[in-house]
Amino acid sequence: MADKKGSSSEKLLYCSFCGKSQHEVKKLIAGPSVFICDECIDLCNEIIRDEATASEKDAAAAARSDLPTPHEIRESLDQYVIGQEQAKKILAVAVYNHYKRLKHLGKKDDVELSKSNILLIGPTGSGKTLLAQTLARLLNVPFVIADATTLTEAGYVGEDVENIIQKLLQNCNYEVEKAQRGIVYIDEIDKISRKSDNPSITRDVSGEGVQQALLKLIEGTMASVPPQGGRKHPNQDFLQVDTTNILFICGGAFDGLEKVIMQRSDKTGIGFAAQVKSKEERDASEVLPQTEPEDLIKFGLIPELIGRLPVVATLSKLDEAALMQILVEPKNALVKQYQKLLAMEGVELEIRPGALSAIARKAIRRKTGARGLRSILEQSLMDVMYDLPNYKGVQKVVIDENTINGDAPPLLMYEEQQPKVAGSN
């Protein structure tokens, strides 16, 4: 390395890029037969930074330029999610407006558009998580699912709310620009409700305290995340992620919310306009669409958090017909998945309508909704999938209502058309 000062007897050295001599610059760094000065190094670094920033912006702009319309979003949701028409319509509009807002962020305007996060209310297995997953896949943005019940306030045992952003970064290879336009789905948000609608004087590390921590994340903050998933410790460089433009979708079953709504409506419905139906006759799916912010506060969510979730969509409990549709109609329907698994063995799978109905009824009895369909079907096909690789000449497996109810094993059809019961020799 050549210093600026030198004796007159020294050979004068020059930067190979700008041509300045060693006396005109602070430092001159030598390589194999070449030299570069500190000024050229600074210029190179500046060019690299500018080009990297420009490429990130171009990539983000390209990703936003093909934003689907609400109708297109709804049509895509229809391919994977059965029923819940009103919820899909609300989500399509909310997501379209959110990413349309991001598309115009760089433009100067007198009107500043606020972010509209989403709250999904519906029973277990009604499609809340699937809706959020499908939206993220359609929009090709980073997506993460967080379980609110595992979160605690900072400093307590459990997951810090900023771990959510860390997982989002992991899902996009730590590209901060991509993560800042992602979607976060927070499940079981109802499980962190405070125990009463009055502020508590005692510490509630997994309830109201977590709501307060989530509030900062949802409304927009600079989250500090350790690089490449490391643990937080002093004197460490953190990745700074701005959560202002991340779309947060919160979901929960909110068991008992319908009672809160009915109590309110019964107080205001006295007289000729009162509800004719009794409380027992009014189904939760009928009552939940009437949810007001005051009901959610009574349930245990803090007012500030409710204010940051202005878009509310309610999902209804799936009936037998809807569950039967879910088994066969979506792109990734369960019946199609198991048919493909058996086709890999060269065997056709036939599930008769009576069996589909029996699966749906069993899921309703278990109160698991669509989430419980796979376990019922898996249980019915377990013996067949275990024995099938050892059988020769099986052409078709037939599942009927008796198989689902456990009264008879699946029927195996052989090449010579001789039916055989699975498990028999």
Swiss-Prot record:
Q: Which Gene Ontology BP terms does the record give?
A: cell division; proteolysis involved in protein catabolic process
List UniProt keywords, sorted A-Z.
Answer: ATP-binding, Chaperone, Metal-binding, Nucleotide-binding, Zinc
Which positions make up the signal peptide?
Answer: none
One GO MF annotation is: ATP hydrolysis activity
Q: Short name of one Pfam family for this protein?
A: ClpB_D2-small
> What sequence ranges are listed for the domain ClpX-type ZB?
3-56
Q: Where does ATP bind?
A: P123, T124, G125, S126, G127, K128, T129, L130
| Keyword Iron-sulfur in record | no
Q: Which domain of life is it from?
A: Bacteria
Disulfide topology? none
A GO cellular component annotation here is: HslUV protease complex
Q: Which InterPro entries match?
A: AAA+_ATPase, ATP-dep_Clp_protease_ClpX, ATPase_AAA_core, Clp_ATPase_C, Clp_protease_ATP-bd_su_ClpX, ClpX_bact, P-loop_NTPase, Znf_CppX_C4
User: Quaternary structure?
Assistant: Component of the ClpX-ClpP complex. Forms a hexameric ring that, in the presence of ATP, binds to fourteen ClpP subunits assembled into a disk-like structure with a central cavity, resembling the structure of eukaryotic proteasomes.
Q: What does this protein do?
A: ATP-dependent specificity component of the Clp protease. It directs the protease to specific substrates. Can perform chaperone functions in the absence of ClpP.
NCBIfam families linked to this entry: clpX (TIGR00382), PRK05342.1 (NF003745)
For this protein, the record's HAMAP family field holds: ClpX
What family is it from?
Belongs to the ClpX chaperone family.
Name assigned to this protein:
ATP-dependent Clp protease ATP-binding subunit ClpX
